[in-house]
Amino acid sequence: MQFIDRAEIEVEGGKGGDGIVAFRREKYVPAGGPAGGNGGKGGSVIFVATQNLQTLLDFQYSRYFKADDGKRGGPNNCTGANGSDRIIKVPCGTVVYDLDSEEIIGDLVTPEQTLIVAAGGKGGLGNRHFLSNNNRAPEYALPGLEGEKRHLRLELKLLAEVGIIGLPNAGKSTLISAVSSARPKIADYPFTTLIPNLGVVRKPTGDGTVFADIPGLIEGAHLGIGLGHEFLRHIERTRLLIHLVSLTSEDPIADYQIIQGELAAYGRGLEKRSQILVFNKIDAVDEETIDNYQKQFAKITNAEILTISAVTGAGLTTLLAKVWQQLEQLERVEDETPSLFS
């Protein structure tokens, strides 16, 4: 499946139905009063978040969505039928922007969350509405109003608690396949992963936590070089990052600093996101090499360093225990943080 995480579309609410001019025409009532009904309301275009979609691919083929118009009013003061709403499913994590104002209209995070993106127009008033002491037989009515029209940009930001970051070939896809049921494409060359891979990892309690392997992070990613500019924003929703460093790289320290620099350059607080620093591929180097790199890293960071082999499974139990501990601490801090609205 092709992964599409950005789309531009047009949406339009339905037009309100017209009010009508009509008079009572009953037997024995030769001069009946006004009886023109109001028009029905136009339908609205409504987004509904769903967990059954993981991409905005559908919007590559359909870019215009319109709700039904309201029906015109009827005689005998009958109001026209309302137009049907146009319901559009979008993935959880979709952010909706108005392209004309560049304002965020909404952020659809939870399943079944709804957002009206184009309201339907009001129905026009029939001549019955204009009856007054001064005008006992109004011969005019109002047309329905046009529905709201909008040009939208949709951006999908993956909903994952834990993001796995690192340079290409650091072993991110191998790690996510080792700890979850995800089966991403894996090969021994850079840029194997061209889309974010999601995997659900089970806690000891049985609850699932979503991990995301974030691809495309290279030097200059925040400027749009490589794939990074498209994927850095997926990190924004994560609560915890696993920073994977391959010990078979020519310069693991430079690799680490490149990623840290890209997070800082992108901004939005990514450089302050909680991280677990992990040496990967310890099965491919000797103990002396591991020890030397631990000493070198200790000079540039105070972070605790975990060591794993995503291939053999060495150290994965310790890593996951650390992840659960960190997430629990983050939840405790968030619970203790006073709300601005309390």
UniProtKB/Swiss-Prot annotation:
* Superkingdom of the organism of origin: Bacteria
The protein's predominant localisation is: cytoplasm
- Pfam families, alphabetized: GTP1_OBG (PF01018), MMR_HSR1 (PF01926)
Q: Where is the OBG-type G domain?
A: 160-328
* Entry binding sites for Mg(2+): 173, 193
Under InterPro entries, the record lists: G_OBG, GTP-bd, GTP-bd_Obg/CgtA, GTP1-OBG_CS, GTP1_OBG_dom, GTP1_OBG_dom_sf, OBG_GTPase, P-loop_NTPase
Indicate the enzyme's highest-level EC class: hydrolase
The record, for PROSITE patterns, names: G_OBG (PS51710), GTP1_OBG (PS00905), OBG (PS51883)
Q: Is Magnesium included in the keywords of this UniProt record?
A: yes
| GO-annotated molecular function | GTP binding; GTPase activity; magnesium ion binding
For GTP, which residues are the binding ones? 166-173, 191-195, 213-216, 280-283, 309-311
Can you tell me which family this protein belongs to? Belongs to the TRAFAC class OBG-HflX-like GTPase superfamily. OBG GTPase family.
Protein name, UniProt field: GTPase Obg
Q: What is the source species?
A: Microcystis aeruginosa (strain NIES-843 / IAM M-2473)
Q: Which gene encodes it?
A: obg
